Amino acid sequence: MRCFFRWTKSFVTAPWSLIFILFTIQYEYGSGKKYGGPCGGRNCSVCQCFPEKGSRGHPGPLGPQGPIGPLGPLGPIGIPGEKGERGDSGSPGPPGEKGDKGPTGVPGFPGVDGVPGHPGPPGPRGKPGVDGYNGSRGDPGYPGERGAPGPGGPPGQPGENGEKGRSVYITGGVKGIQGDRGDPGPPGLPGSRGAQGSPGPMGHAGAPGLAGPIGHPGSPGLKGNPATGLKGQRGEPGEVGQRGPPGPTLLVQPPDLSIYKGEKGVKGMPGMIGPPGPPGRKGAPGVGIKGEKGIPGFPGPRGEPGSHGPPGFPGFKGIQGAAGEPGLFGFLGPKGDLGDRGYPGPPGILLTPAPPLKGVPGDPGPPGYYGEIGDVGLPGPPGPPGRPGETCPGMMGPPGPPGVPGPPGFPGEAGVPGRLDCAPGKPGKPGLPGLPGAPGPEGPPGSDVIYCRPGCPGPMGEKGKVGPPGRRGAKGAKGNKGLCTCPPGPMGPPGPPGPPGRQGSKGDLGLPGWHGEKGDPGQPGAEGPPGPPGRPGAMGPPGHKGEKGDMVISRVKGQKGERGLDGPPGFPGPHGQDGGDGRPGERGDPGPRGDHKDAAPGERGLPGLPGPPGRTGPEGPPGLGFPGPPGQRGLPGEPGRPGTRGFDGTKGQKGDSILCNVSYPGKPGLPGLDGPPGLKGFPGPPGAPGMRCPDGQKGQRGKPGMSGIPGPPGFRGDMGDPGIKGEKGTSPIGPPGPPGSPGKDGQKGIPGDPAFGDPGPPGERGLPGAPGMKGQKGHPGCPGAGGPPGIPGSPGLKGPKGREGSRGFPGIPGSPGHSCERGAPGIPGQPGLPGTPGDPGAPGWKGQPGDMGPSGPAGMKGLPGLPGLPGADGLRGPPGIPGPNGEDGLPGLPGLKGLPGLPGFPGFPGERGKPGPDGEPGRKGEVGEKGWPGLKGDLGERGAKGDRGLPGDAGEAVTSRKGEPGDAGPPGDGGFSGERGDKGSSGMRGGRGDPGRDGLPGLHRGQPGIDGPPGPPGPPGPPGSPGLRGVIGFPGFPGDQGDPGSPGPPGFPGDDGARGPKGYKGDPASQCGPPGPKGEPGSPGYQGRTGVPGEKGFPGDEGPRGPPGRPGQPGSFGPPGCPGDPGMPGLKGHPGEVGDPGPRGDAGDFGRPGPAGVKGPLGSPGLNGLHGLKGEKGTKGASGLLEMGPPGPMGMPGQKGEKGDPGSPGISPPGLPGEKGFPGPPGRPGPPGPAGAPGRAAKGDIPDPGPPGDRGPPGPDGPRGVPGPPGSPGNVDLLKGDPGDCGLPGPPGSRGPPGPPGCQGPPGCDGKDGQKGPMGLPGLPGPPGLPGAPGEKGLPGPPGRKGPVGPPGCRGEPGPPADVDSCPRIPGLPGVPGPRGPEGAMGEPGRRGLPGPGCKGEPGPDGRRGQDGIPGSPGPPGRKGDTGEAGCPGAPGPPGPTGDPGPKGFGPGSLSGFLLVLHSQTDQEPACPVGMPRLWTGYSLLYMEGQEKAHNQDLGLAGSCLPVFSTLPFAYCNIHQVCHYAQRNDRSYWLSSAAPLPMMPLSEEEIRSYISRCAVCEAPAQAVAVHSQDQSIPPCPRTWRSLWIGYSFLMHTGAGDQGGGQALMSPGSCLEDFRAAPFVECQGRQGTCHFFANEYSFWLTTVNPDLQFASGPSPDTLKEVQAQRRKISRCQVCMKHS
């Protein structure tokens, strides 16, 4: 137990444990990559020296941005995002194209009576009617209204003079106020009758209007007839007027004198007629008595006709009148409807044939003989992919190209000691490997730590291969500011307003302004001066006649007075209008300059527009202030461009070395003591039951087994117990050689003979023998050392017990066992060191069936099933209406296989095949003749370091100078990736390197390459013979899937497909089949197109050695050789002086690119980037060359970046110590030491030196010598030194030419099925397949659309004689022939007529195809055919008058093309009603929802019956030419069957029984639904028949607030069965269907007619089905019955 803990402790604390842990971490983080070679490619034979790590260098400059990486692999499908917000309504789309003509609608119900129309226009003048009888005398009319007063009469005769009035003394009277108007005079006679007015329409009586203003008096009327009335009596005196105002007092003399009356003056001239006065007010009514009624006047002239009165009531039916005269002949009527088909007429007369018209096509002739084999046709379309190929082994392939040189072999055994007295001979050929020696005695115990003296620095090695990528480095320092080539950003917001500007200088005078608008009126002006006297006015109108003045007594006539004084000034007049604007004045003089001493600053102006961006200013000084807190981490930047190569780093510090006492093997020692017991091993198979426990006798030693393949070196073990001290070796101890790099594993050696034979002389290398027979199966090798533990696999199924294994070889005798009691079980040990993976075991027996796994995800849609058996022939349908010329049909099924074609042209030589499998080793060949000397071979790979040889003879003391430098060694193995180094300083730009070699093929397949250019077109095939044109058939329904055709010729290469998903692992093959017999040679194929270049193949095996070449030209000087073996150590020299530092070397060239790295694991998805600003469209660049341009010059180094934040601690534990730095340059040589002792001459003059003494303890390290000066160049005369150890690997050579192909190996066994590869390119189209068997006859297609108008038909046969008795014959005049009318549209087909004595019937339906006959020999060419029958007569003449309708035909009419849809609401297809052919069946689609919007289907239209069911029968496409399917939560809703509601969503086959089936039938008329809104079944209208009764289904909603409804006229609104959940929701993306809680169906309810307009309905909840059905309205679907 204690030992165990000690062991565990030593294991955990040993440095190997750290390596072990790191190895597992490396395995974890590196996706399990292993590095070839022991110890992961490191040199384990040297002591591990771990120098301290140097201080961190300055950060290098930021490298240029790397190129954009290749397109990453397609990421995994993301989880569905949350439901997006509802998008804005889209803009209305463009108007769609005009749709097709819809089907004929159902005849509508009669409309409501229209409103009476407007009165029509007056008819033409009628003929004069017959004179009527005199009418009876009418009743007297009502008295008319009072007429208007007549005009004033003429003045009467003058009256007689009255009596003289009395004289009056007037004392200044005034004119009195006008008296009241007198009474009106008597009415005048009526005027003459005016002209007849046009009659007005009869208006409604209006309300009385308001009184209008008094109009101006009219002009006087015409003079009336002279009145004959008598003078009336004088009226009574008027009333006394009011008192007038007092007048001015006139002094009149009193009448003391007598006044004389003057003489009557002369009558004045009549005055001018005054203007008419204003009309007087209406007078009071007169007082006269009403006169008697006058006698009736003469009849007036005939009035104009009145307007149309309202229509009268209908009169009684009159007596039948006498027959009228025959009318005139009318115009020709339009062409009548087509009558029913008449009886067949008598045969027509044979006319002379019209030559140009072509005859009617004849009946099809008998089948012709087989023609000769035609020319090879063009390649057919690509066939379907063929079945997977057989898994038998193929024939032996051609020899592959030579393989890559093998790995270096293991170190050879030590050679035989050379003779001490001979000069060194040529190096011998390598001997056969010796037997393993016996174990030596144990050496002395080693000290814990051995110090090595540091060796001399070796020459600078070549650059090693690029190692695998290192772990991710720490976060780098913050980069310098990048150059911004971004476009300028958007314009910023306006800045703050600037300070007010200084006062500007005075501006120039402006141009004169426009005229201003009219100003407001001014204030009233001051009083103006009096104006000048006006001109005399025009003559005024004459005044009214004055009244007669009173008599004035005047004595004297006065003189004319003088002019009076001016009157007082008048009042100011009104304002005059404003005057017009004046003309602009002349320009004034400039005014004096203003004073701005005390001017206040103006108000702040508006902010100015932003100025253009300024030029970049110089960089400002650093700002003040403390540095702010570090900002949040920014988004990851774009990857930078790859930097140019940096300068080489400075030389590292010298590392410490550990001295290794290398001891060489002594004689074989005694056997060592038993080691401590090992760790507990893995449990072995159960052994056979043991005997009792007495010790057994020691067995005999077994024969040595064959040496196994050495396993990889194990981890370093604990220090062993000290062994027995060995005897002193005989060899003098040489100085330690430089450590060699470990060689790769050599090939397995031939087992030596157990007897110790001397090694024989090596033979010449033989030529490769012919391939040998396959050897027997070899014995199993010894088990290798344990490999690392594999990743635990998933537990397999339990297999049955295996067969008993064969008995193993006897083991090595074990140590004697201890007492036989069984010990207590130990604590479980630590996990053992990893073992190597074992060979794959034989395939196990098939295990027991496992438990059922969880349901997998829904699979892809399966392949179409096998074709069903052909159904029975259906009844023959009625002939369809002739359809239009159909479009080109679908491509036909492949025909029967044709006879084999003629051999094609020889193909171009194919590409080189992939290397074949390794051949079995051949028999040993006989020794060939010696070949010519070959050229100097390439340097071989470095061999493993051999064991130290015995000391050779002392050489002749030839004072040789330093040898030429040795050849460069092969490249070393790639090391582990080191920690990320510190950033180096930036290097100068190197020259462009040579192109690197092709890298090894990557582990993962790269993205598909760009399509290559298309190959040259193949030669054109010979033209095929043209076929006869067939009759275009109706488009059939799609037939069953035919048998697969034979493969077509290769098609054109398709675009590379997207990479398919990884296939499932196939079942292992049971065992290899024997190779099949050799097939017949195929016929040469067509010339293929140039294929897509294949991926680069793996290197093939090494081919046989070619014949020796002719001696070549002598090669150029080789590279200097390796340094020679170290000489004996000289005496220690004096320390030299310190040398000057050497000049700095130039930067080296760029290295070649390393091999492609292993593809890393998928990174986690990055954050979404911000939306970039929209860039401006760039100009199109010139197309670049195909190659990349040379890299640009290196930019100036940027400023040093700011110090970055400290990184978070890394995940990994501290890494391994870095590798030792490169050796420094050699120092100058020290001064020469004193001469050594003279060496022994070859002639034996000097005695042998004594044996060397024991070695003393190592002295302390001396101070480091000063490098000596460089030596002088050696002489060429002297001997060249022995070849030194191989140097470090040289640069990789250029790639050699491919070797010749190797021998063909036997076919290998079938491998297990590989994993499914990526999707291949589509194959080239195969040759045309065999013709398939003819399909079964399809169902009759639906009637096609109405075809175009056909050519004019032949003239019909004469019809039957008309029925003379039914109509009276009125002979008509012959009509004038009308002009030729346009060609009429094709009429509807007539009803089917009576069967006539028919001519030959139409050919019946095609019979089933007979078996192919034997092809006959070609017959002789036929005779020339007879002349065809006469063609049709010419175009028809102009149409005659409309014929009488024909007699009614017999038989059923053709169907009309109306469609009827039936939904069964079960999973059974419904049957069509009798007499209605079924067009198709399908599944009942109710509506679909896409993008959260529903689109409803009317269940009465054929679109609701989809022939194929899918949970998502649609995709959606956008304007970017991209379509998406099953990318959103789109849904479809289907009518459901009566299956019980499921608990879980339905998927796959479960769905079928829940979807209602439907059928589409052709009906003779349109069907409509009628609804009762109560529990009774509503009756169909008269002459309509019932199709089904049901329940009134109104509308439905599903997910969200979306849904639809049924038109109540549509048969879809009458479902035969009522269900609360009549439909099911299918979620397209999941492929499942379910009845969800948010599905609602809406049904018309029953309504009591008495409660139609009553208060609101009473709420109710119905849970029982019968109660629900009683509440739902009933309906019936009816169709017009003709």
UniProtKB/Swiss-Prot annotation:
User: PTM comment for this protein?
Assistant: Prolines at the third position of the tripeptide repeating unit (G-X-Y) are hydroxylated in some or all of the chains. Type IV collagens contain numerous cysteine residues which are involved in inter- and intramolecular disulfide bonding. 12 of these, located in the NC1 domain, are conserved in all known type IV collagens.
Collagen IV NC1 domain spans which residues? 1457-1682
| Bias (Low complexity) ranges | 103-116, 411-426, 632-647, 665-682, 742-758, 857-902, 998-1010, 1034-1044
Q: Where is this region: Triple-helical region?
A: 57-1451
- Which Pfam families does the annotation name? C4, Collagen
What InterPro entries would the database entry show?
Collagen, Collagen_IV_NC, Collagen_IV_NC_sf, Collagen_Structural_Proteins, CTDL_fold
Disulfide-linked positions:
C1472-C1561, C1505-C1558, C1517-C1523, C1580-C1678, C1614-C1675, C1626-C1633
Q: Where is this region: 7S domain?
A: 31-56
Biased composition range(s): Basic and acidic residues: 578-601, 911-929, 938-950
Q: Where is the signal peptide?
A: 1-32
Per UniProt, what is one GO molecular function of this protein? extracellular matrix structural constituent
Q: What GO biological process terms does the UniProt entry carry, in alphabetical order?
A: glomerular basement membrane development
- Summarize tissue expression: Expressed in Bruch's membrane, outer plexiform layer, inner nuclear layer, inner plexiform layer, ganglion cell layer, inner limiting membrane and around the blood vessels of the retina (at protein level). Highly expressed in kidney and lung. Detected at lower levels in heart, muscle and skin.
In this chain, composition skew of type Gly residues spans 969-978
Q: Where is this site: Cleavage?
A: P1197, G1198
Q: Where is the composition biased (Pro residues)?
A: 396-410, 487-500, 609-621, 1011-1025, 1223-1235, 1248-1272, 1289-1304, 1340-1351, 1435-1444
Q: Please give an example of a GO cellular component term from this record.
A: collagen type IV trimer
Q: Where is this region: Disordered?
A: 56-255, 379-1453
Compartments annotated for it: namely:
Secreted, Extracellular space, Extracellular matrix, Basement membrane
Record's keyword terms, sorted: Basement membrane, Collagen, Disulfide bond, Extracellular matrix, Glycoprotein, Hydroxylation, Repeat, Secreted, Signal
The family note in this entry says:
Belongs to the type IV collagen family.
Its function, per the record, reads:
Type IV collagen is the major structural component of glomerular basement membranes (GBM), forming a 'chicken-wire' meshwork together with laminins, proteoglycans and entactin/nidogen.
| Extra remark beyond the main annotation | The kidneys of transgenic mice where the 5' portions of both COL4A3 and COL4A4 and the shared intergenic promoter region were deleted exhibit morphological and ultrastructural features characteristic of the human hereditary disorder Alport syndrome, including disorganization and multilamellar structure of the GBM and delayed onset glomerulonephritis.
Assembly notes: There are six type IV collagen isoforms, alpha 1(IV)-alpha 6(IV), each of which can form a triple helix structure with 2 other chains to generate type IV collagen network. The alpha 3(IV) chain forms a triple helical protomer with alpha 4(IV) and alpha 5(IV); this triple helical structure dimerizes through NC1-NC1 domain interactions such that the alpha 3(IV), alpha 4(IV) and alpha 5(IV) chains of one protomer connect with the alpha 5(IV), alpha 4(IV) and alpha 3(IV) chains of the opposite protomer, respectively. Associates with LAMB2 at the neuromuscular junction and in GBM.
Swiss-Prot/TrEMBL domain comment: Alpha chains of type IV collagen have a non-collagenous domain (NC1) at their C-terminus, frequent interruptions of the G-X-Y repeats in the long central triple-helical domain (which may cause flexibility in the triple helix), and a short N-terminal triple-helical 7S domain.
> In its UniProt entry, what is this protein called?
Collagen alpha-4(IV) chain
Name of the gene encoding the protein in the UniProt record: Col4a4
